[in-house]
């Protein structure tokens, strides 16, 4: 197949787990003999081509007020104007139309549409090509992509989001195939009225950078026990909640926090923490970090579409405490490879921390099941097999519309 992959960013510009998955998918499918090309946004005007790890990549200058990944945060009015233009960006539709006319792919795989907007769907449909849309976040219902505002998860779509997304559900009906990276992610959009006539699939992300590791022959607890968080230091990740609950328990343990964030917010977190027991270790490689801790904690108070960090922690034979928000519970099963906590019951996080601190046999039992419980998720080849099946079915059923979900994932 001749495939075009559309995403907001592409390596070496990495915004999060979505870019890692796109790169793994593109390079993997190219290795299987498919002709692949990537089109992403970039900071420079015009369309510029390059090879990245042997993959042909086009970077198109973003036709909006600014490129959001330059490291500067504009004021609120400028950000609002950016999102208003991103509701339907005709300039980027024209860029995509030109690329499609020149390259004529068999099929276009859309990932994150921020910058491109849903105008990309019209450009692809006008060119007569089928669309596969992969859902990594809540961009189609929330301009920020996370449905999180003023420190809280948005149970309902707020007025400004509804205004900026008022035609998106209707437009999504013209997408041939939609893939959610978790059952939660797919259901959240379908239940909101999206993709009414699309073929629907769930394909879990893989963990492409996790080497095979044998389980430790014997788990020797450190004293003090080490809990660890790794990820973006942003309000939706629940780090404030974690610090509060950890210190409330007064455990014989330490808490390591790895990651980066805006300086003011990181300083706020540090002001809450007792430096004798809570240690901020900066940006760390996840493999090295997981080797230093006994229990991983993913206490998100905003929804996680998938939760790659939880998958990686399990792959390192660690028990994992996760919040019940989003797709995390599809990776970590309560009492099997970790424990659940709920932001609706704040003390549930502290209870989970205490249980694993005081019950070494529970901790070891969860750790012993951790990697096996996610083994099928880890495989890049599994993910590629499932996407190949979806792409082939989409081409074969071009013009057909199905409203029923088809679970391609082997999990």
What are these regions (language model features)?
Residues 230, 254-267:
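Glycosyltransferase donor-sugar binding loop
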Residues 319-322:
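Short hydrophobic beta-strand element within catalytic cores of glycosyltransferases
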Residues 184, 206:
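Carbohydrate-associated surface elements
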Residues 266-284:
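Nucleotide-activated donor-binding/catalytic signature segment of Leloir-type glycosyltransferases, i.e.
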Residues 20, 225, 229-248, 347:
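A conserved mid-protein helix/loop that constitutes part of the nucleotide-sugar donor-binding site
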Residues 139, 155-178, 187-188, 192:
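Membrane-proximal helix-turn-helix segments that form the acceptor-binding/catalytic region
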Residues 348, 355, 362-389:
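A short, well-ordered alpha-helix in the C-terminal region of glycosyltransferases
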Residues 283, 334-335, 339-347, 355-361:
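Conserved acidic donor-binding segment of nucleotide-sugar-dependent glycosyltransferases
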């Amino acid at each position: 197949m001749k495939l075009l992959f559309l995403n907001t960013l592409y390596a070496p510009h990495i915004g999060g787990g979505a870019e890692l998955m796109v790169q793994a998918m593109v390079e993997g499918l190219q290795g299987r003999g498919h002709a692949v090309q990537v089109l992403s946004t970039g900071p420079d005007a015009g369309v510029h081509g390059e090879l990245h790890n042997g993959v042909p990549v086009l970077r198109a200058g973003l036709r909006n007020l600014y490129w959001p990944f330059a490291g500067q945060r504009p004021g609120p009015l400028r950000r609002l104007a950016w999102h208003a233009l991103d509701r339907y960006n005709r300039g980027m539709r024209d860029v995509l139309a030109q690329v499609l006319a020149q390259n004529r792919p068999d099929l276009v795989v859309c990932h994150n549409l921020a910058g491109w907007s849903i105008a990309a769907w019209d450009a692809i449909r006008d060119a007569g090509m089928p669309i596969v849309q992969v859902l990594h976040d809540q961009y189609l219902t929330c301009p920020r992509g996370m449905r999180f505002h003023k420190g809280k998860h948005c149970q309902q779509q707020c007025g400004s989001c509804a205004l900026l997304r008022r035609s998106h559900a209707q437009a999504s009906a013209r997408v041939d195939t939609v893939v959610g990276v978790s059952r939660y992610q797919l259901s959240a959009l379908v239940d909101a009225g999206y993709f009414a006539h699309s073929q629907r699939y769930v394909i879990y992300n893989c963990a492409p950078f996790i080497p095979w590791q044998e389980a430790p022959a014997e788990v020797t607890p450190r004293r003090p026990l080490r809990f660890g968080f790794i990820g973006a230091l942003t309000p939706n990740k629940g780090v404030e909640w974690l610090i509060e609950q950890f210190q409330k328990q007064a455990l014989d343990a330490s808490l390591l926090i790895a990651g980066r964030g805006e300086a003011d917010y990181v300083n706020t977190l540090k002001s809450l923490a007792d430096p004798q027991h809570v240690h901020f270790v900066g940006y760390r490689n996840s493999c090295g970090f997981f080797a230093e801790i006994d229990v991983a904690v993913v206490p998100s108070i905003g929804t996680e579409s998938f939760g790659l960090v939880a998958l990686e922690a399990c792959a390192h034979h660690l028990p994992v405490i996760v919040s019940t928000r989003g797709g995390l519970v599809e990776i970590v099963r309560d009492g099997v490879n970790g424990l659940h906590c709920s932001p609706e019951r704040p003390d549930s996080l502290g209870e989970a921390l205490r249980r694993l601190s005081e019950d070494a046999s529970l901790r070891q039992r969860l750790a012993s099941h951790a990697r096996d419980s996610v083994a099928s998720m880890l495989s890049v080849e599994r993910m590629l097999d499932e996407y190949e099946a979806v792409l082939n079915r989409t081409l074969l059923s071009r013009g057909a519309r199905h409203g029923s979900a088809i679970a391609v994932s082997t999990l």
